[in-house]
């Protein structure tokens, strides 16, 4: 028997999500149901599903997450569980603020990667700007991958989920657009849980507003218009490539632009969120 559930649709720099409000944890979404919801032809279409649930109702204790906090139960489009999604956190925080589910503009959200502090800089029911404390952008080493028989070397970066950020020497934004981005072949010993791969332009010297461009292939999804944790990984790798340990970088993705701050102890991601639709769906 099919079940009818309420949903909303939102995106952050065109990384789009289905939002399911389930504070008491009563909606049991299977991997197959998530896949069907995210199907862009036979379903609603999205890069993933954000289930809005109280951490204490999740049934699984996450270290550092208070049971009373709102928890972002995030699923990739293929139905797999994901530890973290930076763009998803922005949309999640926007949803909470727009529906008066929090009483302050600064609050903490639980994720499978741990607690994430957010600041809602502005919000109405349609649009918001949110800053997320993403935690340390931890470098895990150097690795390589193959994309369409072309080798790319990059920096492994852990943001609660794994990334391989490949800064490509001499790559221009125009040339980046023309790369035939497809599923990467990567070192499974280095990335046993799979990996998100970013192709990144170099950070130019002498800019008042340092910027990079990137494209991303997301684990469990494919190429997306944006990836929040991926922009942080890309900024970390681009700064390191330019001989810098810290800095603020504007990251341009196909879906727009975000601001990433890399600090000694943590990183931040600031960017827009938009809620575009609400409704009900039978699955």
Swiss-Prot record:
<feature type="site" description="Could be important to modulate the pK values of the two catalytic cysteine residues">
    <location>
        <position position="163"/>
    </location>
</feature>
<keyword id="KW-0028">Amino-acid biosynthesis</keyword>
<comment type="subunit">
    <text>Homodimer.</text>
</comment>
<feature type="active site" description="Proton donor">
    <location>
        <position position="85"/>
    </location>
</feature>
<dbReference type="GO" id="GO:0008837">
    <property type="term" value="F:diaminopimelate epimerase activity"/>
</dbReference>
<dbReference type="Pfam" id="PF01678">
    <property type="entry name" value="DAP_epimerase"/>
</dbReference>
<feature type="binding site">
    <location>
        <position position="196"/>
    </location>
    <ligand>
        <name>substrate</name>
    </ligand>
</feature>
<keyword id="KW-0413">Isomerase</keyword>
<dbReference type="GO" id="GO:0005829">
    <property type="term" value="C:cytosol"/>
</dbReference>
<keyword id="KW-0457">Lysine biosynthesis</keyword>
<comment type="similarity">
    <text>Belongs to the diaminopimelate epimerase family.</text>
</comment>
<feature type="binding site">
    <location>
        <position position="76"/>
    </location>
    <ligand>
        <name>substrate</name>
    </ligand>
</feature>
<dbReference type="InterPro" id="IPR001653">
    <property type="entry name" value="DAP_epimerase_DapF"/>
</dbReference>
<feature type="binding site">
    <location>
        <position position="15"/>
    </location>
    <ligand>
        <name>substrate</name>
    </ligand>
</feature>
<feature type="binding site">
    <location>
        <begin position="218"/>
        <end position="219"/>
    </location>
    <ligand>
        <name>substrate</name>
    </ligand>
</feature>
<feature type="site" description="Could be important to modulate the pK values of the two catalytic cysteine residues">
    <location>
        <position position="218"/>
    </location>
</feature>
<protein>
    <recommendedName>
        <fullName>Diaminopimelate epimerase</fullName>
        <ecNumber>5.1.1.7</ecNumber>
    </recommendedName>
</protein>
<dbReference type="InterPro" id="IPR018510">
    <property type="entry name" value="DAP_epimerase_AS"/>
</dbReference>
<comment type="pathway">
    <text>Amino-acid biosynthesis; L-lysine biosynthesis via DAP pathway; DL-2,6-diaminopimelate from LL-2,6-diaminopimelate: step 1/1.</text>
</comment>
<feature type="binding site">
    <location>
        <position position="161"/>
    </location>
    <ligand>
        <name>substrate</name>
    </ligand>
</feature>
<feature type="active site" description="Proton acceptor">
    <location>
        <position position="227"/>
    </location>
</feature>
<feature type="binding site">
    <location>
        <begin position="86"/>
        <end position="87"/>
    </location>
    <ligand>
        <name>substrate</name>
    </ligand>
</feature>
<keyword id="KW-0963">Cytoplasm</keyword>
<comment type="function">
    <text>Catalyzes the stereoinversion of LL-2,6-diaminopimelate (L,L-DAP) to meso-diaminopimelate (meso-DAP), a precursor of L-lysine and an essential component of the bacterial peptidoglycan.</text>
</comment>
<feature type="binding site">
    <location>
        <begin position="228"/>
        <end position="229"/>
    </location>
    <ligand>
        <name>substrate</name>
    </ligand>
</feature>
<dbReference type="GO" id="GO:0009089">
    <property type="term" value="P:lysine biosynthetic process via diaminopimelate"/>
</dbReference>
């Amino acid at each position: 028997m099919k079940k009818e559930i309420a949903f909303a649709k939102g995106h952050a720099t065109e990384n789009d999500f289905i939002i399911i409000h389930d504070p008491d944890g009563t909606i049991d979404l299977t991997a197959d149901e998530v896949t069907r919801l995210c199907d862009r032809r036979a379903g609603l279409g999205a890069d993933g599903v954000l289930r809005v649930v109280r951490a204490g109702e999740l049934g699984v204790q996450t270290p550092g997450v208070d049971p009373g906090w709102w928890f972002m139960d995030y699923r990739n489009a293929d139905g797999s569980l994901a530890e973290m999604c930076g763009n998803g956190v922005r949309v999640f925080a926007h949803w909470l603020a727009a529906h008066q589910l929090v009483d302050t503009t600064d609050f903490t959200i639980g994720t499978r990667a741990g607690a994430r502090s957010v600041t809602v800089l502005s919000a109405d029911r349609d649009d918001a700007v949110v800053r997320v404390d993403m935690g340390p952008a931890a470098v895990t080493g150097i690795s390589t991958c193959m994309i369409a028989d072309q080798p790319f070397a990059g920096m492994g970066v852990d943001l609660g989920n794994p990334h391989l950020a490949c800064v490509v020497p001499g790559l221009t934004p125009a040339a980046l657009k023309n790369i035939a981005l497809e599923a990467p072949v990567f070192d499974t010993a280095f990335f046993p849980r799979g990996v998100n791969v970013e192709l990144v332009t170099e950070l130019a010297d002498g800019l008042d507003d340092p910027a990079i461009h990137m494209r991303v292939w997301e684990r469990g999804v494919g190429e997306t218009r944006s990836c929040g944790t991926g922009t942080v990984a890309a900024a970390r790798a681009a700064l390191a490539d330019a001989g810098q340990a810290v800095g603020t970088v504007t990251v341009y993705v196909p879906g727009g632009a975000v601001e990433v701050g890399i600090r000694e102890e943590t990183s931040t991601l600031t960017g827009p969120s938009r809620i575009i639709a609400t409704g009900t769906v039978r699955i």
